[in-house]
């Protein structure tokens, strides 16, 4: 049977959508790399730059943490802990993978929602990883770092993982209401998995 006339048109539209998203990602990443090209090493894989307004992780094979020079010294340890949590969890790999899947299925609204939820859950998981090690006073400092970093975040780029990226109100609420899981909750969860 002959190929419907509209099928090649849909294929071109799908390919164009992919091209637009990949171009956006490439341009965003190149612009970010240009901004941090003169960043100064602070410690290990942590760099500071006066040309950025918000902390983030950049890179997949050799990821680096970038901090703005303007960051408050009290906020810095919390920001670094948060960004290191991203690296320990492999978020610098998971988020680009999620974006790649979104790119292939850009026409599907469920994929857009899934990507937004992935980004939110990544941030919440890193917040939880950091705050479970903190006392009440330090949690307040962490919330302050979260708010001050989000104020300086102008736009969300496709690949970098940025501290204070999304849902700050929800993240602050989550930090305030955090309780370590009890032994019984953990036991029930383990049994449910088995």
Language-model-derived ranges and their functions:
Residues 1-194:
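Membrane-embedded and juxtamembrane structural elements of multi-pass membrane proteins
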């Amino acid at each position: 049977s002959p190929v419907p006339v509209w099928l090649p048109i849909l294929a071109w539209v799908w390919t164009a959508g992919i091209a637009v998203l990949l171009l956006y990602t490439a341009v965003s990443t190149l612009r970010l790399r240009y901004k941090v090209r003169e960043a100064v090493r602070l410690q290990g894989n942590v760099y500071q730059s006066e040309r950025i307004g918000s902390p983030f992780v950049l890179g997949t094979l050799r990821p680096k943490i970038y901090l703005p020079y303007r960051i408050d010294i009290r906020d810095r340890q919390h920001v670094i802990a948060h960004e290191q949590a991203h690296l320990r969890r492999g978020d610098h790999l998971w988020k680009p993978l999620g974006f790649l899947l979104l790119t292939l299925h850009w026409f599907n609204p469920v994929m857009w929602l899934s990507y937004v939820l992935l980004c939110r859950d990544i941030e919440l998981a890193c917040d939880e990883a950091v705050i479970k090690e903190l006392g009440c006073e330090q949690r307040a400092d962490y919330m302050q770092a979260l708010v001050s970093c989000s104020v300086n975040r102008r736009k969300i780029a496709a690949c970098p993982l940025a501290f204070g990226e999304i849902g700050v109100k929800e993240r602050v609420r989550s930090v305030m209401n955090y309780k370590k899981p009890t032994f019984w909750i953990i036991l029930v969860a383990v049994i449910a998995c088995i």
